[in-house]
Amino acid sequence: GDTGAAAIGAIKDRKNMKIFILHPQNKISEIQRKFMTTVDSSNVFNIALDGNFDECQKFVKSMFSDKDFSKAINMSGVNSINWVRIVIQIVYYFYSYFKVAKENEKINFSVPTGNFGDIYAGYMAKKMGLPINKLIIATNSNDILKRTINTGIYKPLKVQHTVSPSMDIQVASNFERLVFDVCSSDSNKTLKLMNDLNERGEFKLEKEELKKIKENFCSESLSEEETKLVIKEVYKNQKVLIDPHTAI
């Protein structure tokens, strides 16, 4: 929802661009819906799909996979499918580190995670040399990444709709980028795993691949009740009202 609103704000009324925004109907916040659906511009097209975020994303990815089609319309993406977004997100890991850490001190980052884009940017920052100890994948009840780290099996379940809708995702697109990396940049092996996911509904990582992930990541999830409790506690102690994603 936030990405869609920001993209519309950047592209509306541009003569040589059109933007098509997909969102799952009735599964984003009302303010996000209003931001995206009330812009009066001839080059903005908002499409509400009867489904969830994963289904919206699958539809967009299928268009990118059709090379002839995507090239013919000069198609680009504005969420973390686009590598540029990951590159930009890398910056604030460095900024945050230099604001809070001592020289060469290793710190942990806890990142509310849905599509694995933001936290993957942290992983890239670590690979660039930033002294990060662990990246904590913070999830809601859609805890596929936590389950994968614990078992090595990536198996999407039915999406649970929560008070943290930006994390209501079972197929985290950017996790494929991490899989490619821990598979020693073996594109054929990565493709096989992705085909397993599409055809069998799951794939399994080898022990060495899972070990590489655990060296850099850990994960925890919060229930709806736990999320609301954190919001109450922070407000009680700090007089700051945080949103559910921050609470997680």
Model-assigned labels for residue ranges:
Residues 2-248:
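PLP-dependent amino-acid enzyme catalytic core
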